[in-house]
Design a protein with these regions (language model features):
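Phosphate-backbone recognition surface of nucleic-acid-processing proteins
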Residues: 32, 209, 215, 220-296
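Acidic, carboxylate-rich catalytic segments that either coordinate divalent cations
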Residues: 281-318
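Glycine-rich, often acidic, oxyanion-interacting loops/wings at catalytic, nucleic-acid
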Residues: 125-206
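Gly/Thr-rich phosphate-binding beta-strand-loop-beta motif of the actin/hexokinase/Hsp70
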Residues: 2-21, 100
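Short alpha-helix plus adjacent loop in nuclease-associated cores
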Residues: 71-111, 251-259
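Nucleic-acid-processing active sites and adjacent nucleic-acid-binding tracks
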Residues: 21-46
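Short glycine-rich phosphate-binding loop at a beta-alpha junction
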Residues: 45-55
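A short, charged helix-loop
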Residues: 101-123, 161-170
Length: 318
């Protein structure tokens, strides 16, 4: 089987390191840098980008708009392959880009193609998360102010319109200013949620049939798994739910998997908490595991694994 020609790309905040056919060059993460990289690379080549949905997201979108085929390269694969291509285990931008190019060119390796729709969806989700964090920070400051003054506020949830209007009427200018910020952030978050819903594909909408999965959570799950092909066990491992063997000598056991997709893991964990409290099936399963002698933490892990199986059936079987 003929090898495909791949440009290996190691992306950073300010630079992109590219390697192909023994040539290596670094470019800036600007439009001019992207144009130079495309001109420098051989014609009709494919692009394998480490972090295509993170630091490499803008570059990936640019390449796709120019008609190039772009694939996502897993950072863990780079780490493993580095030991093969470098005797000393050298860690550099040159070595990483070279490894990505070499491994991606292997005909037996299958990579996930990056799509503009998924890039846009991930952009919106990331933006919303950023604004939600900012809103949480403002609310925490407001609550801390009330605690220091020994005042019991009229509202506990400062994300509601009534609570914000109440803040805007306060005599303290700092509280009024916080109310204005919260009002603006709420508008931005609501607008982003509408845009995310419009971008939601039909397959992601089917995930909302599972108790505890909202449209936003469904989009997050879909965006994290778009284009990937995996078994139930692989999906559980990818989401960080499946435990990792931790054995040494007579010691036998497992530990938590911290190498999975953390955003996906967070969503599944939140849904498992919701189901253990409000869903009859999830609650019964959770109680059953507790009766078997498992700890609350272990029982919730079991519930998360059951959720993984349900999500996998919708995403990869339907």
């Amino acid at each position: 089987m003929k090898e495909k020609l791949f440009v290996g790309v190691d992306c950073h905040k300010n630079t992109i390191a590219c390697f192909v056919e023994g040539k290596f060059k670094e470019f800036s993460t600007t439009k001019k840098g992207f144009e130079q990289a495309l001109k420098w690379a051989p014609k009709d080549c494919n692009w394998a980008i480490e972090g295509a949905y993170h630091f490499g997201l803008t570059f990936a979108a640019y390449l796709i708009s120019k008609g190039c085929k772009v694939y996502e390269f897993n950072a863990l694969s780079t780490s493993k392959a580095r030991k093969i291509y470098s005797v000393s285990g050298e860690k550099s931008d040159y070595m990483d880009a070279k490894v990505i190019s070499k491994v991606a060119s292997d005909p037996e390796i299958r990579l996930q193609e990056v799509s503009l729709a998924t890039i846009e969806l991930k952009r919106k989700i990331s933006k919303r998360e950023l604004y939600v964090k900012q809103r949480t920070g403002v609310i925490n400051n407001v609550k801390a102010g009330f605690v220091q003054e020994g005042i019991n506020p009229l509202y506990k949830d400062f994300t509601t319109k009534r609570a914000i209007q109440w803040l805007l009427k306060q005599e303290d200018s700092e509280k009024r200013y916080a109310g204005k910020i919260l009002e603006t952030l709420n508008e931005i978050i609501s607008q982003l949620e509408k845009e995310i819903e419009e971008l939601t594909p039909e397959k992601a909408k089917r995930l909302t049939k599972i108790k505890g999965i909202s449209t936003l959570r469904a989009c997050t799950i879909y965006a994290s798994t778009r284009g990937k092909k995996m078994s139930k066990a692989q999906f559980a491992s990818y989401s960080g739910v499946a435990p990792v063997r931790n054995e040494s000598g007579l010691k036998q056991g497992h530990r938590n998997n911290h190498r999975g997709d953390r955003r996906l893991n967070s969503v599944i964990y939140s849904v498992s908490i919701c189901q253990s409290k409000y869903d009859p099936i999830g609650s019964n399963y959770y109680l059953k595991k507790l009766q078997e002698g498992k700890t609350k933490r272990h029982a919730r892990k079991c519930l998360s694994r059951m959720l993984c199986n349900q999500i996998w059936k919708i995403l990869f079987m339907d």
